[in-house]
Amino acid sequence: MKHCYRCGESKDDYRFRPNQPYWHQWCIRCERSPVGNFPLPETKEDVWHDSDEVSPT
């Protein structure tokens, strides 16, 4: 579990991009949320996927 420094929620590690510095860990939802329109609803797209995974579209 990690703590997002923008929304303040504790979330599973897969909700964060890897290799973020510990002093600036934002979840993927917060990274895609523009300033002033926060928070966007959390979706299934807000999880980290390795680049070799194929998207089921």
From Swiss-Prot:
Q: Name one Pfam family in it.
A: NinD
Q: Which domain of life is it from?
A: Viruses
InterPro entries to which the protein is assigned, alphabetical: NinD
Similarity comment text for this entry: Belongs to the ninD family.
Task: Spell out the protein name for this chain.
Answer: Protein ninD
| Source organism per UniProt | Salmonella phage P22 (Bacteriophage P22)
